[in-house]
């Protein structure tokens, strides 16, 4: 099945309406009828605002979390609209993907 992999990037401690942003994203996706999604924590990374590493105590809560969904492109667009309508400004990637099951 040809779908897209929608990856949304958030800071691990960021919140939206009192809920961790990655939890809010998973809940919003479930409300749209998306049947599955995952949030992955990172060990280290860097971006335009510098390097982040789990070993730096003072950076606690600033490591990225990737929230990932494999859905049809139209569903990904619906979720991105929900995110925008909620006033969240988040970085995302939408990549072509193929889902299958091994025998």
What residues fall within each predicted segment?
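Positively charged, small/polar-rich N-terminal and surface patches that mediate targeting and assembly
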Residues: 1-103
């Amino acid at each position: 099945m040809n779908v897209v992999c929608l990856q949304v990037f958030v800071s691990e401690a960021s919140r939206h309406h009192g809920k961790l942003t990655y939890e809010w994203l998973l809940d919003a996706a479930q409300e749209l009828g998306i049947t599955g999604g995952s949030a992955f924590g990172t060990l280290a990374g860097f971006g335009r605002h510098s390097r982040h590493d789990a070993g730096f105590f003072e950076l606690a809560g600033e490591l990225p979390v990737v929230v990932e969904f494999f859905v049809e492109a139209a569903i990904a667009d619906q979720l991105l609209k929900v995110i925008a309508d909620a006033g969240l400004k988040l970085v995302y990637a939408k990549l072509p993907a193929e889902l299958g099951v091994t025998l």
